[in-house]
Amino acid sequence: MPNDSFAIRLREARRMRKLSMDKLVELADFVVTKQSLSRYERGVMRPHANVLSTLAKALDVSEDYFLGTNMHIDMPMLRTTSGGKLHEDDLMAIEARLSYWTERLLAKERAASFSVEFKNPIENFQVSSLEDVIRAADLLRQLWHCGDGPIASVLRLFERKGIRIMEDELPADVYGLSTWADNRLPLMVLDTRHSKTTADRLRFTAAHELAHLLLSFPSSSDLTVEKRCHKFAGFFLFPKSTFIEEMGGEHRDELTLEEMVDLKELYGVSIAAQVHEAWDLHMISREHYDWWYDENIKKNQMEEGWGVYAFPETVGREKRVDARIRNKVK
């Protein structure tokens, strides 16, 4: 671990608990001063063993968390799924928060007898081409018993299948990240703030990160990994055969805003993603695709006034775990 990793982990654990330094000093039974705590978080000083133990108890986490040995978070994958948009310090802070949150969630799941093991039903599925992407999306829907219609909540679906999803405030250009803990536990980090994203964007981001977690990406492809993940997200949310049926055929002279708004409100798929899918399937001409992007989508990237997916796209697993623990205590 880097030399300042303890400082980052202490700071992020305190922030995750929404504690001021004064409050943490109080919870630690005043065995540490606010001045010392500040020095720990700045990396100027390290606590003695007895103080470390007390801080761990106050923050409800193992001492191994501070050493970075409580679990192995796949940092290279976290770095990859950030798209190179994050500074290393930001990545370390996110990794610390993710490690802290995951350790506490797993402990609560054990206490509530509410744990689920994740199984990748399309493990080692090689995705090189658009055809591979479509097959992978269709197969996953089949194996997860999703049918060929709208998926009401992809976040709740992913949680049910064993993917742990942490909500976090991410930097401006980053909407989601994904990685593995101990090579067996899939993790997603999503920025769910309404000020930053919309329900359809959030669904697309989550499906994109799902592709990173489940699929294998051979280097011998004309498509970048990011493009393959984008296309998987689109076809997972709106399957090829269903899209063609909804559009009334395999070829269209033009797409209308009104029909795509209707489909957006039903399937939770943005206008932009629908136009992309129509082009991927050669349903529309390049000229019509360019017209939609240049004259419409680029001028309204948040798609304001173009319909809203009404179903609440939220996470809920941790809330239910907490409820079961509270019920046990009664």
Sequence positions of predicted segments:
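Active-site hotspot residues in diverse enzymes, especially metal/ion-binding acidic/histidine motifs
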Residues: 1-330
